[in-house]
Amino acid sequence: MLSGWSVLKGGNMKYWDKALLSLFMCVSTLSIAATHAVAMEGMQMTKEAREIIAHPKGTKESRGVISLQDYIVEEQAMYDWLFKNHPIFTKYGGKTVGKLVVKDRGEEWIEEGRGNDFSKASKRSGGEGFSSMMYRVARNSTLQYPNKFIGPEKCGECHPAQYETWSRSRHATTIRFPGEHPEVNNKLNDPVFDKDTASILPQGITPDVVYCTVGHIRTKFGFFDAWLLRGTYHVEGGLLKNGTGQIVAGGNQWQRTWALNLSPEVAKKIKKWVPDFPVTLEEYGDNGGYVRGLASYAAKYKKSMSFQASTSYCEVCHPWKFDFKNESEFYAALGNAKELQKHTISKGVSCEECHGAGGHLEGGSGLLISNCERCHQRFSYSPDLMRNNPLNAGKPDLALSSKFKSMGPGCGSEGSQTYFTAHYEKGMRCATCHDPHDVTGNVTGEKGIKGVSYNSEQGYLSSLYSKPKLKKECTDCHKEQAYIQSKADTHSKNSCASCHMPFMMSCENFYAIQFQDQAGFDTQRRAHIWKIDVDPARKSLVAGSTSKDPRDGKDWHFERNEEGRNFVDLMWACARTTWADKDQAEAKGCHSPVVSELKETLHFKDQKQVYNEVMGWQTPVKDKFTQVKVGIQGLYSLLEVKKLAPSDKTRVYELIEKAQDTVDLIEKDGSWGMHGFKYTKQRLDAAVEYINEAQRIMKKSL
């Protein structure tokens, strides 16, 4: 071997150098190819999905019906395709700044919300069944071909009124193609507000490689790329369509609150009150990005990103359907945004998502239902609620809470919040109050916001608020409360929802600004709980026992009162900070230390301060209420033993009835002056005088 080497070396040194260089290049090329192959081959679905795929409990073919596990099995082909064909692998060689973390239906539909733990606590299937905590799965997914969808325009032929109201609702536009964004003049790569804030699409992502955006300017915008992969990344130093630059985890989701409302000046104001509140980009940490207003959602900035097909998460509640005849046509179109858009037969929460493919038409699926729970009853199982309440033993359903996004109740959890309220127990459901065809109402767009283009035909698209049209108002049922509130002065312009349905829900999982004890600041949607808990310390939202630090976001859940129901604590009811609540804006910011226009002494920075203020109203009312009740009881006792002239007796009874009317009104109202302090006190003062006059008549007749 050595002699041969020597001969070659001595015989033709120049030739041998070239040979070595060629050999080195071949080895390098093989190494790179091997690296790419490993990157692709190393990608696999989650252990939950793999376990179900490997050990199915029967099959769709054997049962004749599709069940939860079959939805997970059918997604395998989608992930196999993505692992081979997404540009992350074909153009970038699997190299990303930040780790790829696969998320699929197995994890989202089985494990998320502690589904496996709930199954073990359940008696169903001997504790070995499946439990989809977050979703009531749609009957049809985009992976099933052919489907019977005909599209909302076809439904509108026979249901024109319903179509028109639906078409101008946010349900209709939750999914939009590039070119359908009049509120920003379709400039998806330009900063929306100031030049130092984010654009709707992140760096390196151009409209031609985007299938759709998700969301509205009121809250957030995300995107799905042309391969129907969730946009959890951006591209630095190049463009996705060219395969240039580098894929970077996070910095992917446009956030209205951060981009518009949380200016550095506002952030500094909050930081004086909340020392850990972030001001600089660096202080937003994993949740931040490269520019103000573009957060890392389903990602940690430059550390990790979810590799997640549309089929496993967002598409459940932000759906679309294609008219492809078979799977081959579908997979042939993936990667071509225009082709996917051309074959989209419905998008958004359209008619057939609730009423079934084809609706009631001959050949359709025949479903004539409303299916709000599919998207608005996201649960999460809480071991803490099971342990902490003896009444819950053996009843895992009573230990359910809502799906939380870190420390805040997530979007789509309205129904799971309502589930543990007196309203739900009495039979109230979503459609009791809401018209599912007209969920947005007659919303007026913003005309004076820099960067927002007002369009009169689609005004709601440029609106920063949401005021849904309601079939039934609070006052239709709560007449005593409505009557007293109509007499109020201090809170006369407040709606019921202002206090009883505070904006405390997170759409964005913007955990960097979630400070729940201070009732802020990642707050885009109304809570659906209603019951205000008057307590100096008890909190609506609490960390789980597994949390080493409350800010780690582990197992946060709704606390329960003595009746086992959810409640709104005083800080959230009176002093929350949100920029999404039209009612709060019209009420001069209520008592928020950040946005309130009231005098400084009415800016409440902790719950004890709110409680003391409430006691200042309720205590004198309760004292006088007790005085009136005792007085009435005393008069009835005297009437049993004293004889009065008929006219005096009649007058005493009249006075007692007047006092009792006030007692009944105050008792049914239940706010002890909070709905209208002065009027409540005036009624009680009058009731005291009725008692006094009745007592004088009794004494005169002795």
From Swiss-Prot:
Heme c 7 binds at residues 496, 499-500, 675. Disruption phenotype: Loss of growth based on sulfite respiration. Heme c 2 binds at residues 314, 317-318. It catalyses: [protein]-disulfide + hydrogen sulfide + 2 A + 3 H2O = [protein]-dithiol + sulfite + 2 AH2 + H(+). Pathway: Sulfur metabolism; sulfite reduction. Respiratory sulfite reductase that catalyzes the reduction of sulfite to sulfide in a single step, consuming six electrons in the process. Required for sulfite respiration under anaerobic growth conditions. Has only marginal activity with nitrite. Homotrimer. This is Dissimilatory sulfite reductase MccA. It comes from Wolinella succinogenes (strain ATCC 29543 / DSM 1740 / CCUG 13145 / JCM 31913 / LMG 7466 / NCTC 11488 / FDC 602W) (Vibrio succinogenes). The lineage of its organism: Bacteria, Pseudomonadati, Campylobacterota, Epsilonproteobacteria, Campylobacterales. The gene is mccA.
